[in-house]
Amino acid sequence: MMGVVSTPKVVGRQVYGSLYECDNEVLKDVKRLEEIVKEAAKVGNMTLLDIKSWKIGEGVSVVAIVLESHITIHTWPEYNFATVDVYSCGAHTDPYKAFMYIVNELKAKRYTINEADRSSEF
């Protein structure tokens, strides 16, 4: 129906970006990155279900499954660089707050941020 605005039945919001000039030591520290992701889930009002991490060369990948979707961090310490993706379903969550918490904890001097509304109308 044209002109009718309906409320999405599924609220999906994704915040993702690239972080530059990050703290090199944090980017290498698996345990610290896991702690950051756990706290980001709390800050974003998400329910952490599981977290896995892998050391890949000097870098680290952390993948957290939250009840509402996921949080990921991938790091490249040799470039002081990381990528972050926070995707959540549910109006009660705040992926932007979770993303910004990670930006601050990695001490990024600059970053890009992208936001996508992935809500659906059935």
From Swiss-Prot:
Listed GO biological process terms: spermidine biosynthetic process
Q: What is its EC number?
A: 4.1.1.50
The keyword S-adenosyl-L-methionine is annotated on this UniProt entry: yes
Q: Which pathway does it take part in?
A: Amine and polyamine biosynthesis; S-adenosylmethioninamine biosynthesis; S-adenosylmethioninamine from S-adenosyl-L-methionine: step 1/1
UniProt PTM comment? Is synthesized initially as an inactive proenzyme. Formation of the active enzyme involves a self-maturation process in which the active site pyruvoyl group is generated from an internal serine residue via an autocatalytic post-translational modification. Two non-identical subunits are generated from the proenzyme in this reaction, and the pyruvate is formed at the N-terminus of the alpha chain, which is derived from the carboxyl end of the proenzyme.
May I ask which residue range the UniProt record assigns to the signal sequence?
A: none
Q: Which residues carry this modification: Pyruvic acid (Ser)?
A: S69
The cofactors named for this UniProt entry are: pyruvate
Keyword Phosphoprotein listed: no
| Class of enzymatic activity (EC top level) | lyase
Catalytic reaction equation(s): S-adenosyl-L-methionine + H(+) = S-adenosyl 3-(methylsulfanyl)propylamine + CO2
HAMAP family listed in its UniProt record: AdoMetDC_1
What does this protein do, in the record's words? Catalyzes the decarboxylation of S-adenosylmethionine to S-adenosylmethioninamine (dcAdoMet), the propylamine donor required for the synthesis of the polyamines spermine and spermidine from the diamine putrescine.
How is this protein named in the record?
Answer: S-adenosylmethionine decarboxylase proenzyme
Per the UniProt record, the source organism is Sulfurisphaera tokodaii (strain DSM 16993 / JCM 10545 / NBRC 100140 / 7) (Sulfolobus tokodaii)
Identify the taxonomic lineage of the organism of origin: Archaea, Thermoproteota, Thermoprotei, Sulfolobales, Sulfolobaceae
Task: Give me the gene this protein comes from.
Answer: speH
